[in-house]
């Protein structure tokens, strides 16, 4: 009996020793795992931590919690399994997630289930409101970026089908889409109609039938963006225009006829922008110029209440970027005039490399954004946790040192985020491969809807590259600064009687050229002053100024209404001669200066005067006359 008792005590002692050994071994292993995990998280010294309400923050905390819980489960073995605070399935999933051994479908399902678990009422529509509280506005922007990149990781770039992933989940894929993209028409699994815009051929007046799809409408709608992209075909021009833009678009069609354009146009509308009379005028001009023009009415794919409340002015451009049916397109403002064919843009090496080509605005160093805007945008960057869990990376971010001289894109990033310069991109013409850049376009739209960010930029311009940046995409920016075309004037002679060698052009147009000094396109039309009734308004505003220079209203009106006479182009060096805004054309006129150096400057950002051959001038001014013809 005594021997048996001693034997039991010895066994118990050995068991306790074994358990203690296992305990300390686990602690050492767990510590090493935590150090490794910490090193992975902190590979960027200044990388931010996810906000408290982030799904990735919750998952990381859950991993730490389950590691401790696993130890208790091991120690209690079979005796106290009810102490565990998580299911065996979740523990396995979290361990696989930490070791990057998990299937993407399981990872994505878990991420979005956590999103709903943290906040059952989450909705990206919240970002469209301006709360004027940095903590609230910045947190919502941070969550927006994280959610959109997660959606892209799983369903756009990741090519998973949400209707399949969430087939046996607490997450409803239709509800997920409704909350992720609040501008889309609200759908559910009972939807009987495929989401598709109403498209009308404006030359025939006939409706273009929606394509036949090889799936149930609820499945198509529940994975709308992937299916929409899959059915996008061909190339074309895309516009969004209001009533006031119709006369400009009619001129644009005539220029396209002169240039022998063969690509179709799609005017993308939320449904109420154009009157019956304007539609009739466009149809008539399209027939006369033999241009194919289609009206894309998006009222069938947009949420009416959201669109009426939040989509206006510049936001309409994002509807056009997303809901045209082209695979590749050139987005145009109605007052843009191209001087090269569409193939030039689509064949551009920088466009082919990145899938989106942007052009630089005038360099206006004295106009700036705000530091609080930069602080907000830094919160949109991927957190350390997001980087670890789904591998999000940006071309540029605030945690990494870089040189602004490495590329035009780096220079723009540096000047916006470090120097706070406001104007960088002229979005009058943007070349886009929608199949490649859809996630960045969606990011752009949602950023431009953000109630706070709207106060940080002018319209949609900078959002084109910011959206691609925060979606983790690359993008291309033409390296030549926005410039000016028009009649070339020479500064008066110096006091010693010698020519000044300084030339200037004053006009309302922004011109864009390439590194070979070729004129590509102009924003602002080709009328000397495009602003209606500007002569009368100018005289009424500053009668002494305009009377001393032009005599009377009728003379100024004749000048304003004339075709722009193009003699040359100036790309100014603003560090020497900044842009000068003058009072003409309702303050829309600018002057730029350069020396007549005979194209000797090799640096693209140096100020220079560009003159054209007789053949080039004839072609340019023929287009100007075509634009201004009645």
Residue ranges and their predicted role:
Residues 8-630:
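Glycosyltransferase catalytic domains, chiefly GT-A lineage
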Residues 1-7:
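N-terminal Lys/Arg-rich, disordered targeting/topogenic segments
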């Amino acid at each position: 009996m005594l021997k048996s008792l001693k034997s039991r005590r010895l066994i118990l002692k050995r068991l306790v020793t074994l358990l203690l050994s296992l305990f300390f071994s686990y602690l050492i292993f767990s510590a090493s795992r935590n150090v490794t995990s910490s090193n992975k998280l902190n590979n960027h010294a200044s990388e931010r931590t996810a906000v408290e309400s982030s799904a990735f923050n919750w998952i990381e905390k859950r991993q730490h919690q389950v590691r401790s819980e696993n130890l208790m489960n091991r120690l209690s073995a079979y005796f106290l399994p009810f102490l565990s605070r998580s299911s065996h399935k979740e523990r396995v999933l979290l361990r696989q997630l930490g070791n990057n051994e998990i299937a993407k479908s399981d990872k994505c399902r878990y991420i979005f289930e956590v999103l709903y678990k943290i906040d059952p009422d989450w909705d990206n529509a919240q970002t469209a409101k301006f709360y004027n509280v940095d903590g609230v506005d910045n947190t919502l922007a941070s969550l927006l970026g994280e959610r959109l990149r997660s959606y892209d990781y799983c369903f756009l770039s990741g090519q998973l089908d949400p209707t399949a992933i969430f087939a046996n989940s607490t997450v409803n894929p239709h509800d997920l889409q409704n909350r992720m993209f609040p501008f889309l028409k609200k759908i559910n699994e009972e939807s009987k109609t495929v989401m598709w815009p109403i498209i009308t051929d404006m030359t025939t007046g006939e409706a273009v039938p929606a394509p036949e799809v090889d799936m149930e409408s609820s499945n198509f709608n529940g994975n709308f963006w992937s299916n929409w992209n899959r059915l996008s075909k061909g190339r074309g021009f895309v516009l969004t225009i209001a009533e006031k833009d119709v006369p400009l678009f009619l001129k644009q069609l005539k220029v396209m006829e002169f240039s022998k354009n063969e690509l179709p146009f799609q005017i993308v509308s939320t449904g109420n922008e154009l009157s019956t009379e304007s539609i009739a005028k466009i149809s008539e001009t399209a027939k006369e110029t033999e241009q194919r023009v289609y009206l894309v009415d998006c009222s069938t794919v947009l949420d009416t209440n959201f669109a009426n409340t939040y989509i206006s002015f510049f936001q309409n451009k994002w509807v056009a970027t997303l809901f045209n049916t082209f695979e590749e397109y050139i987005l145009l403002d109605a007052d843009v005039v191209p001087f090269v064919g569409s193939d030039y843009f689509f064949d551009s090496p920088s466009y082919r490399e990145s899938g989106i080509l942007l052009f630089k605005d005038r360099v206006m160093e004295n106009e700036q954004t705000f530091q609080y805007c930069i602080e907000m945008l830094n919160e949109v960057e991927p957190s350390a946790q997001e980087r670890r869990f789904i591998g999000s990376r940006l071309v540029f971010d605030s945690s990494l040192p870089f040189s602004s001289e490495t590329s035009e894109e780096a220079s723009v990033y540096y000047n916006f985020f470090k120097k706070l310069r406001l104007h960088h991109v002229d979005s009058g013409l943007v070349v886009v491969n929608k199949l490649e850049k859809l996630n960045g376009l969606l990011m752009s739209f949602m950023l431009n809807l953000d109630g706070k960010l709207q106060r940080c930029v002018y319209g949609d311009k900078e959002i084109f590259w910011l959206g691609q940046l925060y979606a983790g995409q690359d993008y291309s920016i033409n390296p030549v600064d926005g410039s000016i075309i028009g009649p070339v004037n020479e500064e008066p002679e110096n006091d010693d009687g010698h020519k000044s060698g300084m030339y200037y052009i004053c006009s309302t147009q922004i011109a864009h050229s390439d590194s070979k000094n070729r004129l590509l396109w102009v924003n602002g039309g080709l009328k000397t002053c495009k602003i209606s009734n500007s002569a009368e308004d100018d005289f009424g505003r500053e009668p002494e100024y305009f009377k001393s220079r032009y005599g009377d209203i009728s003379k100024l009106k004749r000048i304003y209404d004339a075709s722009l006479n193009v003699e040359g182009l100036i790309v100014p060096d603003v560090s020497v001669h900044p842009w000068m805004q003058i009072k003409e054309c309702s303050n829309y006129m600018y002057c730029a200066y350069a020396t007549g150096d005979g194209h000797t400057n090799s640096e693209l950002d140096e100020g220079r005067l560009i003159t054209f051959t007789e053949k080039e001038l004839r072609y340019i001014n023929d287009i100007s006359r075509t634009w201004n013809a009645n």
